From Swiss-Prot:
This is ATP synthase epsilon chain. CDD domains: F1-ATPase_delta (cd12152). Keywords: ATP synthesis, Cell membrane, CF(1), Hydrogen ion transport, Ion transport, Membrane, Transport. The lineage of its organism: Bacteria, Bacillati, Bacillota, Bacilli, Bacillales. Coiled coil: none annotated. Belongs to the ATPase epsilon chain family. F-type ATPases have 2 components, CF(1) - the catalytic core - and CF(0) - the membrane proton channel. CF(1) has five subunits: alpha(3), beta(3), gamma(1), delta(1), epsilon(1). CF(0) has three main subunits: a, b and c. It comes from Bacillus mycoides (strain KBAB4). InterPro entries: ATP_F1_dsu/esu_C_sf (IPR036794), ATP_synth_F1_dsu/esu (IPR001469), ATP_synth_F1_dsu/esu_N (IPR020546), ATP_synth_F1_esu_C (IPR020547), ATPsynth_dsu/esu_N (IPR036771). Produces ATP from ADP in the presence of a proton gradient across the membrane. One of its GO terms (molecular function) is ATP binding. Its main location: membrane. It is a peripheral membrane protein. It is found in: Cell membrane. One of its GO terms (cellular component) is plasma membrane.
Length: 133
């Protein structure tokens, strides 16, 4: 099957750069599956896993939102943070989840609930993706 290059990039640099047969992402508008020769598209992404298939192998990368840019010859995912499943520190992700849950339970006026909710979503996503490796 044909392949195409995929780059997942954060402000700290590239996280994933490989040739794949298919990319699956959760865009704000729903699931997207991208194959070689896909029409050009730009879409915002949800906090989720990016699935990258090549042959019988699938790689998983946790992204904290961002954008996907699809060109006929290349796909680029831009995200503020991204981690491959096998690089996720499970202890750190569990700690982040615990802290976010604690902040959401605090009844103090200074707690930014939306920010705590986003932190919780990111931590849960990282834990879910780490289980996919």
């Amino acid at each position: 099957m044909k392949t195409f290059p995929v780059s997942i990039v954060t402000p700290d640099g590239p996280v994933y750069e490989k040739e794949v047969e298919m990319v699956s992402v959760k865009a704000e508008s729903g699931e997207m599956g991208i194959l070689p020769g896909h029409i050009p598209t730009v879409a915002p992404l949800k906090i989720s896993a990016v699935r990258l298939k090549n042959g019988g192998h699938t790689d998983y990368v946790a992204v904290s939102g961002g954008f996907i840019e699809v060109r006929p010859d290349k796909v680029t995912v831009l995200s503020s943070s991204a981690e491959e499943a096998n690089h996720i520190d499970i202890h750190r992700a569990n700690e982040s989840k615990r802290r976010a849950e604690q902040r959401m339970q605090d009844k103090q006026a200074h707690v930014d609930f939306r920010r705590a909710e986003m932190a919780l979503q990111r931590a849960v996503n990282r834990l879910n993706v780490s289980d996919m490796k």
